[in-house]
């Protein structure tokens, strides 16, 4: 192939690439704009939430809008009743008193049409908190949940141990910033967490 033929093939390839980009770029920008502007058309499904909790692996509270008083907080499923969508967990964390262990129960219910499923977390002392499952990423095995505590809206991002063994959940961090816009973000997990 002489120089003129190489240049001609190069020009054709570049023209094809430019035309492809011209058609794809508006679509890509629209998807990006929806995410950055907090597109609210996505509604978490009951199947996504139940799949997230069906794991036998530890689930870490990776980031929260509440303060960083508890570090390395994780939950591990101890039992489940699929007929009632009830999951029992052992919770461990580190705080200024040591490494407490406590227990909690998650109850899921079908949400109304176009609404996320209901989720109630009951602590061992009987205190209940209603959570809203907001977003899930099946690739990063993470979920973002919102709730109200002391009259203030809060957010938490939970990530499967299988994910954070190998990677940092970048997509989930981005979604946390969108779903929990304007809230503080404290990372509670680090690779030095003991369990």
List each language-model region with its residue ranges:
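A beta-rich soluble binding module of mature secreted/lumenal proteins
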Residues: 2-195
């Amino acid at each position: 192939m002489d120089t003129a033929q190489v240049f001609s093939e190069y020009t054709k390839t570049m023209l094809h690439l430019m035309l492809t980009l011209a058609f794809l770029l508006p679509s890509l920008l629209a998807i990006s704009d929806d995410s950055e502007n907090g597109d609210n058309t996505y509604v978490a499904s009951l199947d996504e939430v139940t799949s997230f909790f069906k794991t036998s692996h530890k689930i870490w509270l990776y980031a929260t809008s509440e303060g960083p008083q508890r570090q390395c907080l994780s939950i591990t499923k101890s039992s489940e009743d699929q007929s009632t969508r009830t999951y029992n967990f052992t919770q461990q964390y580190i705080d200024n008193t040591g490494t407490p262990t406590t227990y909690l129960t998650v109850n899921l219910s079908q949400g109304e049409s176009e609404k996320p499923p209901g989720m109630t977390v009951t602590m061992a002392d009987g205190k209940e908190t209603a959570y809203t499952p907001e977003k899930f990423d099946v690739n990063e095995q993470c979920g973002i949940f919102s709730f109200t505590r002391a009259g203030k809206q809060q957010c938490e991002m939970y990530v499967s141990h299988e994910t954070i063994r190998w990677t940092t959940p970048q997509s989930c961090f981005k979604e946390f910033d969108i779903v929990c816009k304007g809230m503080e973000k404290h990372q509670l997990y680090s690779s030095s967490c003991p369990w």
